[in-house]
Amino acid sequence: MAQLRMFQVDAFTKTRFAGNPAAVVLLDTWLPDAVLTAIAAENNLAETAFLVATAQDGYELRWFTPTSEVPLCGHATLASALVLADEIGLSPPFRFHTRKSGTLQVDRSETGYSMRLPRRTVVPGGDPAEIAAVLGIPVLETRFVPVDGDDMVLAVVADEGALMAMRPDI
């Protein structure tokens, strides 16, 4: 049986067992998607990041939930950069080439990690009344962000107080 190098990282925190956990798996070559999904299912975290070094300037990066591949995962990307820097001993910035989100760059400064995300097109769309019913707060307007495999609706609310009053009905 092949051995895999795998790490679990709590993103967005300096405290153990806090933040947003993600697994990071370093691969020599890509495994079949069914195997990547099975590994993510066994990890039982929101996302598992899989990395393969490229011949050029970075890494190919893919993210899997316990059931499927997703087009983008911010916290697992940051976790991947931390593993490359702190566990493997490489120096940022890191360039991650993805299948559905373009190239992401992660850098590190004295204050922490930062990531450059792809620019997305925002178009009119979504039903404010429907989104308001789900969020449990008044929604002023909605916008649609088409992303291959992960379309998003943005809700505009009056202020931070409205956002803090949100009680989602999911």
For the regions a protein language model found, what residue spans apply to each?
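Active-site proximal loop and beta-alpha junction motif in alpha/beta enzyme cores
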Residues: 1-73, 78-170
